[in-house]
Amino acid sequence: MIWAPSGRPLRADGFAWRYHARHESVFERGATLQQIGPFEMRRLKALSNTIFGVAMTLLAYDLPKASVFKDAPTWIDLVRAYAQPLIALMISFIVAGLFWFSHHRRLSVAPEGSRGEVFLNLIFLVSIIILPVTNGLYGAYRLDGVVAVLYGAHLTVIATLNALLWFLALRGRGNRELLTTAIYPVFVFLIGTVVAAIVPPIAQFIWCLAFGAPLAGWMAARR
């Protein structure tokens, strides 16, 4: 004899078996819902690869085209046309590459995350999407204080989001190398942005110091 959840016996006929099977499937679905755990961060890899790839490609979109020259350009013409955009392109491309590497390394270190971490990762990816916009402005008006500060502030936001995500990924685990590698660019970009507000042409040299983040992490690990 089959007993219903209310405690009343059911007839051992077709109706009773259907009732039991239906409620058993409901109970199984409830147990499955309770077993849903943290989000698998590896699912973000394909999305992040696409976003980084498109953003890093669009960095070259604002480079001057051949149509800007009325005649065959001289070396001086080429330098005047391409110097500033290429400087901005190289800084942004290397920065994006470093953060792409850091992003994938972080997903490997912390393969699971909460909804909040997933949402923060999406905000981080949005900041990467916007990089071609600020890069285009900086390439055209590199010596302008307002544009230089805007570009530096954007780099600082990207670095800060990356560092925050590393803090969340490493919570409860002290790893000086990884934390230093993530935090170092934040201070470099912040200092460079302050300098950009005062002496815009010097800021680009300070921002390039962020490329030494892996070295800073390596030195921190050896102490």
Identify the role of each PLM range.
Residues 1-2, 26:
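Short hydrophobic transmembrane-like helices used for membrane targeting/insertion
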